[in-house]
Amino acid sequence: MTRAKSGKISKNRHKKILKLAKGYRGRANSCFRVAIEKVEKALQYAYRDRRNRKRDFRGLWIQRINAAVREHGFVYSQFIGALKKAEIDIDRKVLAELAVNNSDGFASIVEKTKAHI
């Protein structure tokens, strides 16, 4: 009986990894042993940074809201506290969008919260 070496299976696995490694520098795009390490590390970075992206965007929204609120004489933390007391349920993403693109709408929200500070 002949020896089965899983030729087709391993070739497909190698092809899959090398396809993911396309565009890498040096031997990482052509040598399977190097490519598999680089692809695994890249997937780890992608997994980590998908979570970090949420953190980064929240920070960006807070910075934008803080800058817009300071033009009206408030601080971010006071403004968010006043929003909660006024029972205005708008998330930070929408507030930042209003602050950047619709300053009149944002100003009206700030006016509604002034009574609750």
Swiss-Prot record:
Please give the SUPFAM superfamilies that the UniProt record associates with this protein.
Answer: Ribosomal protein L20 (SSF74731)
Keyword line: Ribonucleoprotein, Ribosomal protein, RNA-binding, rRNA-binding
What InterPro entries does the annotation carry?
Ribosomal_bL20 (IPR005813), RIBOSOMAL_L20_CS (IPR049946), Ribosomal_protein_bL20_C (IPR035566)
Record Pfam families? Ribosomal_L20
The record's Gene Ontology cellular component field reads: ribonucleoprotein complex; ribosome
Gene3D superfamilies to which the protein is assigned, alphabetical: 6.10.160.10, Ribosomal protein L20
In alphabetical order, the GO MF annotations are: rRNA binding; structural constituent of ribosome
Give any single GO term for biological process.
ribosomal large subunit assembly
NCBIfam families of this UniProt entry?
rplT_bact
Please explain the role this protein plays, according to its UniProt record: Binds directly to 23S ribosomal RNA and is necessary for the in vitro assembly process of the 50S ribosomal subunit. It is not involved in the protein synthesizing functions of that subunit.
Q: Which family is this sequence assigned to?
A: Belongs to the bacterial ribosomal protein bL20 family.
Protein name listed in UniProt: Large ribosomal subunit protein bL20
Q: Which organism is it from?
A: Rickettsia akari (strain Hartford)
Q: Which gene encodes it?
A: rplT
